[in-house]
Amino acid sequence: MASYTPGTYEGAARGYGGKLFVRVTVSEDRIEAVTVTQHKEYRGIAWGLNTTPIERYPELIVEYQTLNIPVVDGADLTCAAILDATAAALKAAGASKEDIAALRAAPAPKAPEYPDEVRTVDVVVCGAGAGGLAAAIEAKLAGADVVIVEKQGITGGATARSGGKLLGAGTRWQKKQGLFDTKDMVYDYLMDVGNRSGKFMDASKNRYLVDHLNQTLDWLTSIEATVKGDPMQVLAQPWEPLSRPVEKDGVLKTHFDVLDVEPIHVSLQPWRVHNSPGGGGQTNGEGGEISTPLTLYYENDLGGEIIYDTAMDEILTDEAGAVTGVTCTRKGGAKLTLYARKGVILATGGYARNKDMVARYPVAHYFSNVPHGNVGDGLTAAEKLGARNYEHPAVQVVYTSLTNGVGINDESGLIVNNRGERVVNEWSYQYTVSDAIARSGSNCGWYITSGKEPYGGVQYGYKAAVAGKSKDPCAASIEGLAKKMGCDPATLQATYDRYCELVERGVDEDFGKPAEFLHPIKGPKFVALRLHPCVTVTFGGLETDISARVMKPDGSVIPHLYAAGEVAGTGMYGTQYPTCGTSIGSALFYGRIAGRAVTDQALL
């Protein structure tokens, strides 16, 4: 049994978003209270839900007197941070290394033991990301008995880990900022970008989506969700001002709102990317501002059921080929069979975590920040029924530094592929740059700099490389740099010499970059910041019609099977991601369509 000096102690550890602090009160031999006092973790991943660890872990530590708490799948880093910070506080209270080791090995809360089970409901939704939540809400509002099956211990899917951006077309937020935009302008932009490298775009589905972009935003902002829990603890979380709960009739309510509108890229007009609360420029962690209110509304206000930690295995059909339900496996191995009277909606996400599926693209050694469960299982399950899975010739890939963020902002110095060749106007939308690198057959990019460009990330990366504090190569010559990069010195030297010539002339004859972004690279030290491929959104997916029904190659539909979100092929991508906000916006819209179609409601 551990021995402590009675009192209250502080501890800290690094979480997903930064340092996390706890306050622990102990008696001589017990942990009496644990409170997370400060953190920078993300809403919808670490906190804000009925299942997130910042709400659950402190009381479990106290109740079971253990640091051996089961991980909330999807929030692994936050779970570890709470336990490590608590251990640090206990050490300050006098616990020995042996005491801490014993607490980490102490009996964990017993996992629920589920029997094999067979149930019948109206609608089964597989996946609780943006598309699945929107579908479930629409079906529930129509009076259907709905169950969501979710692999993780939290909702949100890839949306919760995203920057939380949404696409709009002439919205009230754009007008407030004096921005002129129309649905036709957005439609033309999407079709132009998507068809630059081939005829990939589905005109009818894109028209349908764009015509309802603003309605989707209005629907999302209209939802008021009940927040449960002790009000003092709830309000102690790091809420963004726009989503901070307010009391209505004795109940705390939260909702989604748009903070502001930002450009797709500084080179592109008009501005049409709508930011979640949390501010513009973010590339991850703010998407929980979208998924959390949807989850709370579905669970707390509509009484909807989510079966967590449960993976869909197989889609069931009758003799005529109509879908009748799914089989699933719970954590622990219990089998769950769910029959669906009205239909099954697949919202299982993409396949960015399936290395075999991504292997056909030139993105070897890629990384991804999407949930580990995004392995394309919805695609393969539907394919077994004869569904058409369109294997698109591209995925969303952005080449970015893992240490300084260069590649995802507006840096516009010299970028080369892994052979040392310049292949693009660097002052372009990041996905245009990435698409050019990928299409050149390169599985990485390099940002060549002498640290003089006016970009914080570049200067940070340059200084770290010069000081030997990073793995990015540094050399006194371009030839020496090329050797460290692993490319042909003559090729990189020729590229560098040509670039310097264009800088001197003030005209980019090769790729048309504006003169003010032709930054000189003169040494005395040269650094190459490695840009790694990051895969997030995957293109293609199950062919669906305008009602979100899953189709076969012959154009017929599979009765009672629907798809929304990344698993669905919405016909809206070419070889590059057109703009932030496209994926979440289409997931919400076609999720709503699926939820309405499966319950025989009029479409939007």
Regions found by a protein language model. Name each.
Residues 63-67, 168-209:
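Glycine-rich active-site loop/strand segments that organize a redox cofactor
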Residues 118-148, 599:
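N-terminal Rossmann-like FAD-binding beta1-loop-alpha1 element of flavoenzymes
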Residues 331-400, 584, 593:
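Glycine-rich loop(s) and the adjacent beta-strand/alpha-helix scaffold that form part
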Residues 379-383, 388-489:
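An anion/pyrophosphate-binding glycine-rich loop and adjacent beta-alpha core
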Residues 141-162:
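Glycine-rich FAD pyrophosphate-binding loop
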Residues 208-334, 503-523:
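Conserved redox-cofactor binding core of oxidoreductases
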Residues 3-106:
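Active-site- and interface-proximal helix/loop "cap" or "latch" segments in soluble metabolic
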Residues 39, 314, 491-575:
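A glycine-rich dinucleotide-binding beta-alpha-beta segment and adjacent secondary-structure elements
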